[in-house]
UniProtKB/Swiss-Prot annotation:
It is found in: Secreted. EPDs are synthesized in the meninx and secreted in the cerebrospinal fluid. Keywords: Calcium, Disulfide bond, Glycoprotein, Secreted, Signal. Glycans are attached at N73, N96. The keyword Transferase does not apply. SMART domains: EPEND (SM00026). May play a role in neural plasticity. May be involved during axon regeneration. This is Ependymin. The lineage of its organism: Eukaryota, Metazoa, Chordata, Craniata, Vertebrata.
Amino acid sequence: MHTVKLLCVVFSCLCAIGWASHHSHRQPCHSPQLTSGTMKVVSTGGHDLASGEFSYDSKTNKFRFVEDTTHANKTSYMDVLIHFEEGVLYEIDSKNESCKKETLQFRKHLMEIPVDATHESESYMGSPSLTEQGLRVRVWNGKFPELHAHYSLSTTSCGCLTVSGSYYGEKKDLFFSFFGVETEVDDLQVFAPPAYCEGVSFEEAPDDHSFFDLFHD
């Protein structure tokens, strides 16, 4: 297991160089090819919206999220597979072996920093002087004009792992947190739709249908 440690030790020299760079000219970094861990989503009002295991392939831009069935008392739980490059969203019901397939016109999300994001700041969470008691993060901001929304992302300075993200839209505000992130995915088949999804017809969705629509009260 290649568990990612929050405090950058091995790359401390590289981080120091990056720290000295002029922040306003920093270009968005790229996340590792494969990441997995736990993702939690809450509304800014404090309501838990979803919590579960995520897997992300940054090279193919594919994302899988399976909600933890023990997290909350719900009648249904989320299992989604998104192929962002192709603009396809699968809602999977493995219990009943059924599948819903939708078009996804808006293809940006918070697992990857958008190329037009602006670097806002770099700082420590916790203590910068105590061993393994702090985390250096970079904060990125930007807008999603198509959604009339804006966002903020925090990533590790070394490794470009997403730590947290905020989405502020006309209809909802969301806060994303990522825990126990590893730079591997145990089973790459999580990025392939189940066989029972084959032959399922597309359900057309509005042009502003997005990843963020999955999370609501």
